[in-house]
Amino acid sequence: MSSYANHQVLAGLTLGKSTDYRDTYDASLLQGVPRSLNRDPLGLKADNLPFHGTDIWTLYELSWLNAKGLPQVAVGHVELDYTSANLIESKSFKLYLNSFNQTRFNNWDEVRQTLERDLSTCAQGKVSVALYRLDELEGQPIGHFNGTCIDDQDITIDNYEFTTDYLENATSGEKVVEETLVSHLLKSNCLITHQPDWGSIQIQYRGRQIDREKLLRYLVSFRHHNEFHEQCVERIFNDLLRFCQPEKLSVYARYTRRGGLDINPWRSNSDFVPSTTRLVRQ
């Protein structure tokens, strides 16, 4: 269990509670979670973070009415900056988007501006929003993470409790390598409901070579770990930086969707550019 799982801030969330669905616009449905909840225990300070990055959200269930009452549908792309005070709690985001369903907007840009304003207010930070018509995305290929997949290892695992022990002495030799490693075995659980969160992760680094077996065991140890997606990515970045001490490091996870939303956080201390094409499980 995370050290802050019972924090009073989390007690006020709608997540894990029975809620009514509203179909007329209501910005108050959005709820933020302070990033400091998991950053403080990791020793990460807002004014001296070892990374940059964004939380990339894809909105698959977004609909509203135009000025004449005709329903509109779109796919939304949201990027929430790592410097924001809060992350956006996903169930509240879903409830908020549902409140657009029977609300009239004059045009698409009004919808985009409304989303950007409300999300920025909730996150207390920079947020960008783009809306796409369905025909703009039709035929878009399924993407994949570039890199070497480390999943096909003939190893025995019988412990699924989170630990950083596997990263102790996880680098070898003095030779500096630059490589990208990929795993599709990342599974953590919602901090509140403990529902499973399934993801693929890409780790790009420059430094002493990381032992792939130890890295895979470390990633598998998240299987019983309860944290939000964004928090897991920052924990992984921080642990790799601490134990493996790479010169450059980027960590990018793309999670499967729930409630019409997928969350894809990345953190980097280099010039990393994330691919935003959905993966096969998304």
Swiss-Prot record:
Pathway stated in the Swiss-Prot or TrEMBL entry: tRNA modification; tRNA-queuosine biosynthesis
Keyword line: Cytoplasm, NADP, Oxidoreductase, Queuosine biosynthesis
One example GO MF annotation: preQ1 synthase activity
Principal location class: cytoplasm
GO cellular component: cytoplasm
Record keyword Nuclease present: no
Binding residues annotated for NADPH, in chain numbering: S90, K91, R258, G259
Biological function: Catalyzes the NADPH-dependent reduction of 7-cyano-7-deazaguanine (preQ0) to 7-aminomethyl-7-deazaguanine (preQ1).
Family to which the UniProt record says this protein belongs: Belongs to the GTP cyclohydrolase I family. QueF type 2 subfamily.
Protein name, as recorded: NADPH-dependent 7-cyano-7-deazaguanine reductase
